[in-house]
């Protein structure tokens, strides 16, 4: 907590007396003619609500400097198919306008605004019995640059995600969105559930553990939506069987509440009606705590009109913390003020809550500050104005607010998940965006955030108003439209892949077990081609196609045999992909023959053969710098004669490794030609066929290459490319390897490098991939960052292996596997345009030769216990096997707010469990991560 006593004596200008706008809401500029609280076109009272809504949209676009909507209804839009994404927003033309404009830029044509019930229809779902599909025959579509078009859709477009302004009871928006077969961001029922202050306050206290104003609630009926659990701190419930004749009970309960310990710090209370009808309204009355009889009378008076699922709340008026200030410049008395903090939180990747924006509104302290009662400010500016001069304290409070807002959404989503589909308005209805209001109070000398309630649109309106005001004075665009557009588009893409038939080539080992869980999560129908007829994944897929393709020099023949198997079973896959090194060329051949998106087989072959990759890049001399600048001198080795010739062209020390290898198996630093001869002889004797060491490319033979040794730090760059366009890039750092074998020891994500050095790595990786013809897919590029800049080690024409997919989800959110599936379907995946890490991960590899005995002796059980508590991340990699060509068996990682914290936790854990030793110095392996 932040202590009031620690506040700096430095103080900004004293708060001036302000004029208040009164009870009417000040909506954003794009809502000047719009009814607040999410009311749609039918609620406007206009004789032709659809025409009025369209006029409001044009007026708003004009004010925002956007081109007016083009009418294309005379030329119906045709050709929509099962892979077309349609994010449909029902109702108000302005409540989601910034999100629609952002989504139109990110994914042109996918965002569609429906202004009237006649523009859409419901038909029984073909995939979900008992549900409905929403078909759009007309809508306003959003394109890049703020362009919009009124369009007719022939045939009607099927919505893949639906949200809207689910306002008054029985509204057409709520009826159209009920029981749909696609994800629905809210519903009329969920809106009424979320907007009830009593219910949200109960959940914020009980499930999120947040302080709430002391509240006494009088309810009637059963209230089925209230959780069946003990009363949470701060909320006391009084159930009235009959609202009439309860004056004595009300008087006793009110008296006990006012005199109770929870009310000791407070002097005033408010009496309000709670329920859907009363959302966003002012309190019915406010009283001093000592006016017990008047308070009881106010409560009793409201009981007469109380409906089922409504309540009367008696709540403490929690004052905003009064911070030490310098004497004001004016001699006029300073009035007590109140501060309301609005937060907007969305369901981000992996269903994790993410705070999008914060805006604050100030007002006089006599009554609670309403949404829209004044122009908002940012959190930092508001805290400075309030007297919090210390920047570190403001930053700490902002961090506490983020944690509280995200915990609030997590609690509300968990409670929402306990509702039945009928209570939610459909099996696919979930809240994806919500607002949570807070007060800043002072409790026992420390600043404390007090949660008030949740809402659907009011916090969003306030935050969008704040963004619009910032735009007026030249501030860069805020995060709300971008984050919400990404949220909606991502949810729609997850629905698009449901039920798709995916031809997967190669199952991989234990390190790829996550694929089968992900397939269930995304609803994929996996048809697996695998060389091992006894593979454990055989029972986890839709179709298991055992076929021995390990001799990869015959991949052309294998492709024909696999096609025959597909035809014999009547399988027509929607996509074909592989994440297993050995199978990438066969996958490219199958994509080519099936007419499915993917990279050309020649490009994949070029990347798979390491010496050809570098020799090709050395011939690429166009560009500044050209791709040749990132290549490294190397020579192919198929005989000892090749070793002699390579020794004359490649300077020593050099690196000798398998031409088609994977997992650093057989990689070795050699100081001279003699060492290279010895290593080649040993490797050619030990590793001759795939059976000698499965999964490391021996199906192409055991040729080697000799490559110049590049000094510097090692890094992985994971790229997502759609038809040559870069959609996403992430850089991770590797620790110093165990020379001379170069086996990976440690890693961290995100990279500790400065942004400009990361940009060097990303651009080098991108130039190398494009130069090799890899323009469509998820690729993992290994580079060294030398004093002279990036140098390529190798390109893996598949997504990153080991722990990378898991770490990427934990740190940034997006799923590389889902991105690979979408690209294989021919769709550009929606990824964060400005990825921000949620945490730092640092991990260390475990080896059977070093740690096998400890792992079998109880260390593994201890690690699994820590993983269940969320204290470590474990990624099993390979079965325990030591020997000359050992691979890591386990990755152990810890999280922190930065590299120092993550590495400190990991080192302490490794020392405690015996993973760290003089022979395996974890501290040294982590030393690069600063």
Swiss-Prot record:
Protein EC: 6.3.2.11
Domain of life, source organism: Eukaryota
Residues given in the record as Mg(2+) 2 binding sites: 794, 796
GO biological process: one example: carnosine biosynthetic process
Signal peptide: none
Matching InterPro entries: ATP-grasp, BL00235/CARNS1_N, CARNS1
Keyword tags: ATP-binding, Ligase, Magnesium, Manganese, Metal-binding, Nucleotide-binding
Cofactor binding note of this UniProt entry: Binds 2 magnesium or manganese ions per subunit.
Record: residues binding Mn(2+) 2: 794, 796
Residue positions binding ATP: 650-716
Gene3D superfamilies in the cross-refs: 3.40.50.20, ATP-grasp fold, B domain
Cofactor: Mg(2+); Mn(2+)
The protein's name in its UniProt record: Carnosine synthase 1
Species for this entry: Gallus gallus
């Amino acid at each position: 907590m932040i202590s009031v006593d620690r506040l700096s004596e430095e103080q900004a200008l004293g708060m001036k007396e302000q004029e208040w706008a009164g009870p009417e809401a000040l909506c954003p500029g794009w809502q000047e003619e719009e009814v607040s609280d999410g009311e749609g076109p039918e609620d406007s009272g206009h004789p032709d609500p659809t025409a009025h809504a369209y006029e409001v949209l044009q007026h708003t676009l004009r004010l925002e400097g956007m081109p007016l909507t083009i009418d294309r209804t005379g030329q119906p839009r045709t050709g929509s198919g099962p892979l077309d994404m349609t994010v449909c927003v029902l109702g108000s033309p302005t409540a989601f306008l910034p999100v629609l404009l952002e989504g139109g830029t990110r994914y042109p044509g996918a965002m569609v605004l429906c202004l009237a019930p006649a523009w859409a229809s419901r038909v029984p779902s073909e995939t979900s019995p008992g549900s409905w599909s929403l078909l759009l025959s007309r809508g306003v579509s959003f394109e890049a640059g703020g362009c919009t078009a009124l369009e007719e859709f022939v045939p009607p477009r099927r919505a893949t995600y639906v949200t809207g302004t689910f306002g008054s009871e029985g509204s057409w928006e709520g009826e159209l969105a009920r029981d749909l077969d696609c994800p629905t961001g809210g519903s009329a029922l969920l809106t009424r559930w979320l907007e009830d202050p009593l219910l949200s306050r109960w959940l914020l206290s009980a499930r999120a553990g947040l302080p709430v104003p002391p509240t006494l609630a009088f309810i009637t009926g059963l209230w089925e939506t209230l959780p069946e659990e003990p009363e949470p701190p701060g909320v006391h419930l009084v159930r009235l069987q009959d609202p009439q004749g309860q004056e004595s009970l009300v008087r006793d309960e009110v008296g006990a509440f006012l005199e109770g310990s929870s009310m000791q710090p407070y002097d005033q209370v408010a009496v309000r009606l709670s329920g859907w009808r009363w959302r966003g309204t002012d309190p019915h009355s406010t009283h001093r705590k000592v006016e017990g009889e008047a308070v009881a009378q106010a409560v009793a008076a409201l009981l007469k009109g109380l409906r089922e699922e409504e309540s009367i709340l008696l709540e403490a008026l929690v004052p905003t913390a009064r911070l030490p200030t310098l004497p004001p410049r004016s001699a006029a008395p300073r009035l007590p003020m109140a501060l309301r903090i609005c937060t907007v939180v969305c369901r981000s990747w992996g269903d994790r809550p993410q705070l999008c924006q914060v805006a604050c509104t100030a007002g006089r302290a006599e009554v609670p500050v309403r949404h829209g009662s004044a122009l908002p400010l940012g959190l930092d500016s508001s805290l400075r104005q309030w007297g919090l001069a210390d920047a570190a304290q403001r930053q700490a409070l902002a961090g506490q607010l983020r944690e509280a807002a995200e915990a609030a959404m997590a609690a509300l989503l968990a409670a929402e998940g306990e509702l039945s589909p009928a209570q939610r308005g459909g099996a696919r209805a979930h809240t994806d965006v919500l607002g949570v209001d807070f007060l800043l109070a002072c409790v026992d000398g420390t600043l404390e955030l007090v949660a008030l309630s949740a809402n659907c649109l009011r916090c969003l309106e306030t935050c969008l108003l704040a963004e619009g005001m910032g735009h007026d004075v030249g501030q860069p665009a805020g995060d709300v439209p971008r984050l919400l557009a990404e949220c909606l588009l991502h949810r729609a893409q997850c629905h698009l892949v449901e039920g798709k038939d995916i031809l997967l080539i190669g199952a991989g080992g234990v390190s790829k077990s996550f694929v089968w869980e992900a397939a269930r999560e995304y609803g994929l129908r996996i048809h697996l081609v695998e060389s091992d007829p006894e593979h454990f994944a055989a029972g986890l897929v839709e179709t298991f196609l055992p076929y021995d393709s390990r001799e990869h020099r015959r991949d052309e023949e294998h492709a024909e045999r696999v096609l025959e198997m597909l035809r014999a079973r009547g399988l027509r896959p929607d996509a074909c992909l592989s994440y297993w090194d050995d199978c990438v060329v066969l996958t490219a051949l199958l994509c080519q023959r099936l007419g499915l998106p993917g990279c050309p087989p020649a490009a994949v072959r070029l990347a798979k053969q390491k010496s050809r990759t570098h020799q090709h890049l050395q011939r690429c001399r166009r560009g500044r710098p050209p791709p040749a600048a990132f290549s490294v001198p190397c020579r192919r080795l198929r005989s000892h004669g090749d070793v002699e010739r390579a020794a004359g062209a490649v300077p020593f020390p050099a690196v000798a490794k398998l031409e088609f290898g994977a997992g650093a198996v057989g990689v070795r630093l050699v100081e001279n030609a003699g060492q290279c001869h010895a290593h080649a002889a040993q490797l050619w004797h030990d590793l001759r066929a795939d059976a000698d060491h499965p999964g490391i490319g021996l199906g192409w033979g055991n040729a080697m290459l000799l490559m110049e040794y590049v000094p510097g730090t090692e890094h992985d760059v994971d790229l997502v490319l759609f038809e040559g366009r870069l959609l996403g890039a992430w850089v991770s750092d590797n620790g110093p390897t165990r020379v001379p074998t170069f086996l990976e020891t440690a890693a961290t994500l995100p990279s500790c490098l400065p942004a400009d050095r990361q940009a060097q790595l990303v651009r080098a990786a991108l130039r190398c991939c494009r130069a090799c013809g890899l323009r469509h897919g998820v690729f993992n590029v290994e580079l060294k960052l030398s004093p002279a800049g990036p140098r390529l080690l190798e390109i893996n024409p598949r997504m990153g292996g080991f722990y990378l997919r898991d770490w990427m989800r934990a740190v940034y959110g997006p799923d590389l596997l889902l991105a690979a599936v979408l690209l294989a379907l021919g769709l550009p995946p929606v990824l964060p345009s400005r990825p921000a890490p949620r945490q730092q991960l640092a991990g260390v590899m475990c080896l059977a030769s070093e740690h096998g005995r400890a792992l079998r002796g109880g260390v593994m059980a201890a690690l699994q216990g820590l993983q269940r508590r969320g204290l470590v991340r474990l990624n099993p990699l390979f079965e325990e096997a030591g020997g000359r060509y050992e691979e890591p068996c386990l990755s152990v990682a810890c999280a922190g707010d930065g590299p120092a914290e993550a590495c400190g936790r990991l080192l302490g854990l490794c020392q405690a469990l015996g993973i760290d030793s003089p022979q395996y110095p974890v501290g040294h392996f982590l030393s690069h991560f600063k």
